[in-house]
Amino acid sequence: LGGYETQEGYYTKSHKYVRSTCPSGISDDLKEQFYQYGIRTVIDLRSDYELVHQPHSLKGYKDIEYYHINLLQNENMSVLPNDIKDYQDLSGFYIFMIEANKKQFKKVFNIFLNHPYDCTLFNCSAGKDRTGVIACMLLDLAGCHEYDIVKDYSESYENNMAMIKQLEDM
């Protein structure tokens, strides 16, 4: 999330917050690339079900601290395409997700606060919905322009269309 201009004329710091799909089943070389990039903290936002089916490759890697915060802890929540199709638009789903998981969102931001100097990777399965909401909140808190926040989210949506098929097959 680095390089965005804020409304005050500053820029968000690079190598601080990294939004990602789940790095499951990645090679040792790619793990090392994440490490060399500076990743020292990981926040995995996936459900328990998702963890079982796609274990996180950076969990237990070197000195990376791994946290699991299930942002779908509410039993009525799902991000599978068939389950969210009844929302008129995704904003209604996101509001419900935030309202239903306030404690989990607080835990995520406490991790950010407790790791002020670490490069933190946060991920869900596709890197779009759960991570997108967190990224929007971080960029908004940093004072970024609304159009940059929307642009950041929109790019992730386009980049992750292929992941939808994988999620449907889970």
What are these regions (language model features)?
Residues 1-121, 133-170:
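Cys-dependent protein tyrosine phosphatase-like superfamily
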